[in-house]
Design a protein with these regions (language model features):
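Transmembrane-helix signature of 12-pass secondary carriers
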Residues: 1-563
Length: 563
């Protein structure tokens, strides 16, 4: 059995019949020599639709730290928030994300991308409005924090649902040559979300400087955090309609046509030819017969009869197609477990889930508790007026984001189709472990400039590494019919790691010290590099072709192929 052809070696398909595709489809011709990181207009449009969820995810992640500090002044007169409630607020979105990733991932495979896509964004909008309506003046301080935490769980369900949805929608439409680049571009919106969150904090605080600093109205910080949270509604509303009206992709429709196995070499070769072309969306199919009457001539009776027969055949085909889809839905749960009951598939799922879990223990452990880092570099806001403290924290967050966060994503975009996902993930884990080891071993000895440099490199190799590739891997390694479910499971395991960090970091750092916690993160990164060895390289690999060949091999082994 020959392995799947690399896209660069796929035979030309000059006689490909005309297809009618949605305005988001990018038809990739064999002679296209565009660099992988240069996107077409349609790919940029898809990037805008799918990327907003990750922008909102990072925006929410990085504003929760300054928001929590603002709530100290609004609710507790500048005293620290109760540790349990503070952890609940920070972990709330991640708790919801686990639910959303499981639920939306399975639903996207079962009901279809079109039926589900956009609902997660509606949930984000609804939860954001609920958050900014927190009645801090009517509830007790603890009651206000509980209100906020509950709405953040709902917000997390929507944000979590966006992971498998956007990954599947993009991968279903991606050209094989630029699939990793497109997914990396989408995920890079996390970098911009954190950057804009830090910048927005500074700008809003500057607008409130006279009120808080000169007039001494510290309680007005209540308006600052509500505006900061509410700004996320702008990109959410801006892309909602596009998501709700996005057609179903051809790749998904083809994958759900039933359980007919691939039984001949020609079918597999056709899949290989299509691997270079964007599968796109074929909702707008125009029959060739529609052109026969465009010149105003009368159709002969014999042709009319043939047309009637064609219409009847088309109706019968549509009926069979609907029956196939119904059968596919009915059997989806069984097929999913049957597919992952094989060790060759299960070990890949274990690899994607475990790597994402280990990454997020370290990544979110650092980024949900940036106050520890800001303290080391002198931007923790430990002195001065309330406004000065908040402004210092905002500047510190901006420095951290600009130095390592955004650059790491774009180095991945430029190199992912050259270096491959596996190499980037392993080196990212190992180099992140290196800088975690330096920070842990010299935590109290490093000068401020040295600490900033080490932390910037740590963030850089998180993002030019496992933080990006753990998102790409489940979308690229599993076939279309199981893609969203497997991606949702992998992402949920990652968020479980984030929850562990959010709830355990503060208490652990007080018991055993921050350097010891950083050594734990070091161990997570080393283990992540080891579990990456379970994963295949997916550059130039079409999982639907692999799945089709596996089906064909199964049929051949069991003697069901015609000889």
């Amino acid at each position: 059995m020959s392995p799947p052809a690399h896209p660069d070696s796929a035979p030309a398909n000059q006689d490909r019949p005309t297809t009618y595709k949605s305005n988001l489809e990018e038809y990739e011709r064999e002679g296209d020599v565009r660099l992988p990181f240069l996107l077409s207009y349609r790919e940029v449009k898809l990037l805008g639709i799918a990327g907003v969820g990750f922008f909102l995810d990072a925006y929410d992640l990085f504003i929760i730290n300054p928001v929590a500090t603002m709530l100290q002044y609004r609710l507790y007169g500048g005293e620290e928030l109760p540790p349990g409630l503070e952890g609940f607020i920070k972990a709330g979105a991640n708790i919801g994300s686990v639910i959303g990733q499981f639920a939306f991932g399975y639903s996207a495979d079962y009901f279809g991308r079109k039926a589900v896509y956009g609902k997660e964004l509606m949930l984000i909008i609804f939860a954001t409005i609920g958050t900014i309506c927190d009645p801090t003046g009517a509830l007790s301080p603890s009651g206000s924090l509980i209100w906020l935490a509950v709405w953040r769980i709902i917000l997390g369900i929507g944000i979590g649902g966006d992971y498998p949805m956007s990954a599947s929608v993009a991968t279903d439409r991606a050209n094989l040559r630029r699939r990793g680049t497109l997914l990396s571009y989408i995920f890079a919106n996390q970098g911009w979300g954190s950057f804009v969150g830090s910048l927005a904090t500074i700008i809003i605080l500057l607008c409130y400087k006279h009120t808080m600093e000169v007039d001494g109205k510290t309680s007005k910080v209540d308006g600052v955090w509500r505006i900061l949270v509410g700004l996320s509604l702008i990109p959410a509303f801006g892309t909602l309609y596009q998501r709700l009206t996005l057609p179903e992709s051809t790749r998904y429709v083809e994958s759900r046509k039933g359980n007919v196995p691939v039984a001949d070499e020609e079918s597999i070769e056709e899949l290989k030819k299509k691997a270079n072309a964007d599968p796109g969306v074929s909702e707008k199919v125009t029959p060739a017969s529609s052109e026969t009457e465009s010149d105003g001539t009368r159709t002969p009776p014999s042709e009319t009869a043939a047309t009637d027969e064609s219409a009847a055949a088309a109706a019968a085909a549509a009926k069979r197609h609907a029956a196939d889809l119904a059968a596919a839905k009915k059997n989806h749960f069984r097929e999913f477990f049957q597919y992952f009951s094989e060790w060759r598939h299960l070990k890949v799922l274990i690899g994607t889930c475990t790597c994402w879990f280990l990454l997020d223990v370290a990544f979110y452990g650092i980024n949900l508790n940036q106050n520890v880092v800001l303290q080391q570099i002198g931007f923790d806001g430990s002195s001065g007026s309330p406004w000065n403290r908040l402004f210092k924290i905002g500047i510190g967050n901006l420095i951290v984001t600009a130095l390592g966060f955004v650059p790491g994503y774009y180095v991945t975009i430029l190199t992912i189709e050259k270096l491959g996902r596996k190499w980037i993930q392993i080196q990212g884990f190992l180099l992140a472990a290196l800088f975690l080891g330096v920070l842990a071993g010299k935590f109290h000895e490093l000068s401020t400039p040295a600490f900033i440099v080490c932390f910037a490199f740590l963030q850089f190799f998180f993002n030019f590494g496992a933080n990006t590739t753990t998102y790409c891997y489940p979308a690229e390694v599993f076939p279309t019919r199981f893609r969203a479910s497997a991606h949702g499971m992998s992402a949920a395991c990652g968020k479980a790691g984030a929850i562990v960090s959010a709830l355990a970091f503060n208490s652990l750092s007080k018991k055993i010290g921050t350097p010891a916690v950083l050594w734990i993160f070091f161990g997570c990164c080393i283990a992540g590099a080891g579990f990456t060895l379970l994963l295949p390289e997916v550059r130039g690999r079409d999982p639907d072709i692999v799945y089709a060949e596996e089906q064909r091999e199964y049929e051949r082994t069991h003697g069901r192929l015609a000889h």
